[in-house]
Amino acid sequence: MAEEVNERTRLLSQSDDPSPSLEELEEWEEPRNWKVSYRWLCIAVISVYGLISPVIAAIIVPAMPQIATDLNVTDPGMLQAFVSVYVLGWSFAPLVVGPLSEVYGRISLLNTGHGLFLVFNALCAFARSDYELLILRFITGAVGSAPLSIGAGIIGDLWAPEERGLSISLYTLGPLLGPAIAPITGAYIVSHTSWRAIFAWCSLYILITWVVGLCTLRETFRPVLIQRKQAAAVRKGQLPGSVQHHHKSLADVFRQDLRRPFTFLGTQPIIQVLSLFMGYLFGLNHLSITTFESVWTDIYNQTPSRAALNYISIAGGFILGSQITGSLNDRIYIYYTSKDPAKGTPELRTILMLPAALLVPTGLLIYGWSAQTHSHWIMPNIGIGIYALGLIMSYQCIQAYVLDCYAVYAASAMGALTILRSLLGFVLPILAPLIYRTLGYGWGSSLLALWALVMGGLVPILLWRYGAVLRKRSGILEEM
């Protein structure tokens, strides 16, 4: 009996009909039915994976003077590029890794990427010229981006929609918290050793987490688990030898899977809107991180090591916002669905984006104008903390919305978001010196706050009003 191969599972050839028990997972095999403690262990490991890549993006900021001296770098733009080109690397790998994880599985690609991440980050410590370091930083960013695209898919594999809030809060905390704590760590290392030691210590961290991941993580993607179950049954003779799980040719992978993020970005208005908004937030975060130290060294005349301690305010805002959003997101979802399960739509994730739309610009205004007027040092810290709280609220709501909409293809959807997210994360920090030099911290932050208010207000309103209609008209979502 011929059956059409399901695009999401790609399990069998079209001419075979295996035992029904092998077409599905047993209850105990379902990732969402695994022990809660183990599922949280998986989330913790991928969150730790996701933390180190953003840390390495910003940890060299306090080491810029040493790098400039050691590698004879005289162009400030080149120093800024050491950070920006790393972020640019994030925009490429997820376009490949995300779709491939939906063909070959999440964990194998995640661990392979982390191993390559270890190798190229270690090589950065041996760079002898600015261009060597620039190229190695780009490659390191690319291979280190796997957790940023695959992690959301793993959360969707392990948790039901009403349970995802806290896991998303933990997972998204790392990529945003990393750049905030990185300068503190980098300043400490540089003050005691050299900039090359930064890469050595980070490589040690990557090695330890990689070993932990290899020992603890197992595949979570349901279609791949079914494929492996059927392949094992064939090897054991429990299925006829003619029954083989479907293997895609390399041409099929390129034609169907690797183009999926571009298809999402080109045909899905939801992805287009959210990628612009998320890209702006991501770029804004890296702009703030890379210029934050100069506020304290240039305006408040603090030493680099003392200036780095002010990043605690950013970290505090991220941690507080993460915990608030994770808990409230689940409570809001459960509240609406307990009355009517049909109300359990992705649009519930946009509710918390509205208060976040006020927090981000408010924090930026307090931060920028207090720095401009040389107010007490606590005021810029309060402002940047409020901004960080609102930013992570928006960030987590976007992740949750996309995950609810594109559960099966979550990794590809995140890959589509990554394109503009990383490009703006690359461009905005480069423009930061021009913005603040031309407008000052007050008006420069006001300009950034205005865009944050407009986008932060419009996006949740548009999705709440038209999100269901757009999802209904989406041909991709109809196939899922």
Swiss-Prot record:
Keyword flag Transmembrane: yes
SUPFAM superfamilies noted in UniProt: MFS general substrate transporter
Biased composition, class Low complexity, residue ranges: 11-22
Entry's localization field: Membrane
GO MF term list: transmembrane transporter activity
Pfam families per the UniProt record, alphabetical: MFS_1
GO CC annotation: membrane
Stretches for region Disordered: 1-24
Keywords, ordered alphabetically: Membrane, Transmembrane, Transmembrane helix
Membrane topology: Multi-pass membrane protein
Biased composition (Basic and acidic residues): 1-10
Superkingdom of origin organism: Eukaryota
TM region positions: 41-61, 81-101, 107-127, 138-158, 170-190, 197-217, 264-284, 308-328, 351-371, 378-398, 415-435, 443-463
PANTHER family from the UniProt entry: MAJOR FACILITATOR SUPERFAMILY (PTHR23502), MAJOR FACILITATOR SUPERFAMILY (MFS) PROFILE DOMAIN-CONTAINING PROTEIN-RELATED (PTHR23502:SF60)
Family from the record: Belongs to the major facilitator superfamily.
Role played: MFS-type transporter; part of the gene cluster that mediates the biosynthesis of oryzines, natural products with an unusual maleidride backbone.
The protein's name: MFS-type transporter oryF
Native source organism of the sequence: Aspergillus oryzae (strain ATCC 42149 / RIB 40) (Yellow koji mold)
